[in-house]
Amino acid sequence: MAGRPLPSWREGAARSTILGWLDRATGPGPGHVPLVDRVAVFDNDGTLWTERPTYTQALFIADRLRAAAAVDAGLAADPVLQALLTGGLGAAMAHGLDALAGLVLKAQAGMTADAFLADARSWFATSRHPSGRPYPATVYQPMLELLDLLRSHDFRSFIVTGGGVEFVRAVSWPLYGIPPADVIGTAVQLRLERHDGRAELVREAAFDGPPNEGAPKAVNIHRHIGQRPVIAAGNSDGDREMLEYVATGEPSDLCLLLEHDDPEREDVYGGRSVTTDPDAEPVGTVARRSGWTVISMRSDWTQVFPAAPS
């Protein structure tokens, strides 16, 4: 790559560790990683794009539920949707994630996979984040640079998200240069239907397995990729098992934990996940004890988001 690698990263331990690891992994000496083993996995929410004030997919869901309520009186009577309409997303989420997820599944049941894909892409391209930024400008510029750097060294990067796999696949290529086939996430059950000579996949009102958080991330990496990655990046307790799975490989493997400690440019919050054990040891403590590379958004990045188009 021309110019200074990782240009939005400050000189410091995190940048030096990443570049030093890559030099060893792609050089001829100890620590060399063969081409076939150059696999990296990245969490998405809070690792590749912002998850503040809430998850991007939750904002998409809220918009689509409001639209559905206008044409479906039965759906509009649901207490969770009533909370959304009168008190916003926070009020709806107060009913619990299971209740909100069930409402979403019900509202989107019967939609074809292709229609969902087109809807997600349209929303992403035309809607605005609560910050006022277009959604493509809510990704983290330094992480885009890391993905580009890995690509230039023949690494294949996968997204391993707790979010909906179809939602992230809708935008993974234009945002990150990661093809839809290389996205692993929480899945909805699908059925095949035939209409007018066409075979279509249709969404059902049920998840296909547990949410892709915690231990399922490691399991689904093995199922989807078939080998242990050599790089992992995350930011929350929901990523702990994925990071541990990668760290349990060769001693040279690289584990990265992003900490959100920048109130001026993004937010300050810990790595707790709403879907994992609240009594578990914090992932930041695990990272420091295990010798993983901890990235400070405030100290290690000169720029957080890409320049937003006018």
Give, region by region, the residue ranges found by the protein language model:
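C-terminal cap/substrate-recognition subdomain and adjoining C-terminal extension
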Residues: 1-23, 32, 114-310
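Charged, low-complexity surface segments at secondary-structure and domain boundaries
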Residues: 1-8, 47, 89, 100-106
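N-terminal carbohydrate-binding/catalytic regions of secreted carbohydrate-active enzymes
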Residues: 21-26, 31, 35-38, 52
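Asp-based phosphoryl-transfer active-site loop
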Residues: 37-54, 243
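Short catalytic/ligand-binding loop motif for oxyanion handling, primarily in non-cytosolic enzymes
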Residues: 50, 58, 167-168
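A metal-dependent, Asp-based hydrolase signature
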Residues: 53-137, 141
